[in-house]
Amino acid sequence: KTKKSFSADLGVEENEILNLKDGDELILVRASQQRGLEMAREMERYDLAALALIVKAVNDIAAQGGYFVSFADQIICGEGAADEVAKFRHYLAAAAGKAHAVYMASSSVDVTTSIFTDGVLAAGVGLGIKRNGYAKKEPTEGDSIIGICTSSTAGIGIDIYSKVILEDMRNGVNDYIEELDEIAGEAMITPPPNYANLIQKLYDSFDVKDIIPISKLGLVPDIAAVTGGEDKIKIQPSDWEYPKIIKLMQKEANLTDDFIIKHFNAGIGLAIIVDEKVELPILLELNEMGVEAYSIGKIIK
């Protein structure tokens, strides 16, 4: 393919492809959400679960300093996944103009797990190009943690949502919940926002130490996985407002703030670790961009 047609397929600017350099790294990520997919099957809304997985892959790649490559803006399942990954190597080589120069450790990469016998997909797969020369910085005591707000659950804690909203409150997945102004199942598996452009802008414009998509275990454990332990961070949940679905959970199940920040995303889609000195300029810039963001915590050791 020509660079122009390739860039159109990827949804990226042509100059980004022209900037590929020797030493750029490929990133492969997989985002699984088995419970969400089961719920999607019951709702006949596979598109919601699929999109959630795609966007998780996009955000993970962007947070690693990479450009998302969208051959994988589809969900790939079963044996076909390895073939798609192998194909990607050749597309990337054509884009770089060096057909011999793109190396992948294996031509056959097992990237998905099929969880349904009827062929319904199990994982979102993303391949990206890591920007040459980008390096994250180690968080240090006193650094600030900025949170970007979201109304999406990101699929975190979905079993707890199911227990409270479906079982305890006796709702079906397709039932309308007045407090949420939404269908129960849709509220639980709403896809997270695509943060790729915002992440790139933050990396390019500010001295950001790390950016963490809150999309795996919960707000505190996802940040702790990067900082080296929960004892190294202090999150202040009173500093921002939870989305409607978490407020409903808190009311119905009498959940504490400490439980919420450990088992859900708590309404935070991205956590940004920065030096305390640049916290205010970043918050002001985000506010000007129309992005709801708050100082949510500190690195304490």
Put a short name on every predicted segment:
Residues 1-301:
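Helix-biased detector of long, well-ordered alpha-helical tracts
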